[in-house]
From Swiss-Prot:
Broad-specificity nucleoside monophosphate (NMP) kinase that catalyzes the reversible transfer of the terminal phosphate group between nucleoside triphosphates and monophosphates. Also has ATPase activity. Involved in the late cytoplasmic maturation steps of the 40S ribosomal particles, specifically 18S rRNA maturation. While NMP activity is not required for ribosome maturation, ATPase activity is. Associates transiently with small ribosomal subunit protein uS11. ATP hydrolysis breaks the interaction with uS11. It is an enzyme of class 2 (transferase). This is Adenylate kinase isoenzyme 6. Keywords: ATP-binding, Cytoplasm, Kinase, Nucleotide-binding, Nucleus, Ribosome biogenesis, rRNA processing, Transferase. The gene is Ak6. It is found in: Cytoplasm; Nucleus, Nucleoplasm; Nucleus, Cajal body.
Length: 172
């Protein structure tokens, strides 16, 4: 049976991981957090002193994910999307969170001031939405609000319905 590949993207703190794990649990699709994949496989290309974090080796991440993506049925969670091959995804969801809520979430994570401000600016200027629109066909890119717990359930239901329809349409 053919299964779709889904990308969940958005600024850190918008709820990609929470949504992705719950969606995978309910749908039976496989969940992949690119940050965890990189950490476990040491898929890095240096260290960013300014932000205090490793630099992702995008080519190695793509090589690592390629077999799973070809097979299908994968939910990918990452805050960037411009290095993934366009052919991988059947739909892309960009999660969006109001700035005040996002600020509190990132502050709770212990983000230092520059990292906090840069991520809030990223959300204000819709950087990741624009990146998704530039990287994929417009008709497969969708924005979802991610401010309150009720919206999480709404998003899961909406994506689950999309998955069901996709499976029906692609498995005669």
């Amino acid at each position: 049976m053919k299964l779709p590949n889904i990308l969940l993207t958005g600024t850190p703190g918008v709820g990609k991981t929470t949504l992705g794990k719950e969606l995978a649990s309910r749908s039976g699709l496989k969940y992949v957090n690119v940050g965890d994949l990189a950490r476990e496989g040491h898929l890095y290309d240096g260290y960013d002193e300014e932000y205090g974090c490793p630099i992702l080796d995008e080519d190695r991440v793509v090589d690592e994910l390629e077999p799973q993506m070809t097979e299908g049925g994968v939910i990918v969670d990452y805050h960037g999307c411009d290095f993934f091959p366009e052919r991988w995804f059947h739909i892309v969801f960009v999660l969006r969170t109001d700035n005040g809520i996002l600020y509190k979430r990132l502050e709770t994570r212990g983000y230092h001031e520059k990292k906090l401000q840069d991520n809030i600016q990223c959300e204000i200027f819709q950087v990741l939405y624009e990146e998704a629109m530039a990287s994929y066909k417009e008709e497969i890119v969708h924005q979802l609000p991610s401010n309150e717990p009720e919206q999480l359930e709404d998003n899961i239901n909406q994506i689950s319905k999309w998955i069901e329809q996709w499976v029906k349409d692609h498995n005669p």
